[in-house]
Amino acid sequence: MNKYLVLLATLFMGMQAASAQNLTQGSLEVLRSQQSVKVVVDYSNAIIMDMTEAEFAEYEEDWYKDQPTIISDLIDEVNQRSGHLLYMSAHRESDYTLRWSVRYIYESGDIVSDFYLESADGEVVAKIADVVGEGGAFGTKLYRIKSGAESTGRALGKFFKRELM
């Protein structure tokens, strides 16, 4: 009996995690008139494999070198999965910025994040909470994190497509 309860609880929590992202503040309506959105990443409050970002950077010497690839992996997946409704870029200036606020990165590379859509003056226009991306099963820590970024991008891209179509 207890085995079945544990199994049911696990299935329920897995289903919640798979559909966890939701718009918890504001509206995405402003994006309908935009052609591009700048994307930045914020690790300032992140716990990365039980370490702060600074501690993880000491442990993993390629952390700062690999960050452009990590954000690029996320952006590529968002652009593709959203059906190219918007052009997301880490380098193009825009009226709006999407701030990827990473909360947790687990050993598996799973990433839990919030996303904030901010106007040019820094006002938060919308918040998308609890976006979960699954990391990789094999490889180095950075490889698993990159897999988590891709998965996060897929989830966010599908969310944008659903919300903006």
Regions found by a protein language model. Give the residues of each.
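Structured segments of extracytoplasmic/periplasmic soluble domains
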Residues: D73-H84, A155-E163
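Short, well-ordered alpha-helical segments
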Residues: Y64-S72, D76, K146, E150, ...
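Generic structural motif
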Residues: Y4, D42-A46, I105, A120
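Sec-dependent N-terminal signal peptides
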Residues: Y4-M15
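Positively charged n-region of N-terminal signal peptides that target proteins for export
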Residues: M1-Y4, A20
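C-terminal/domain-edge helix-coil "capping" segments
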Residues: Q21-V30, D121-M165
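A structural "domain/chain start" motif
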Residues: S19-S72, K161-M165
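Surface-exposed short loop/turn segments
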Residues: R81-Y143
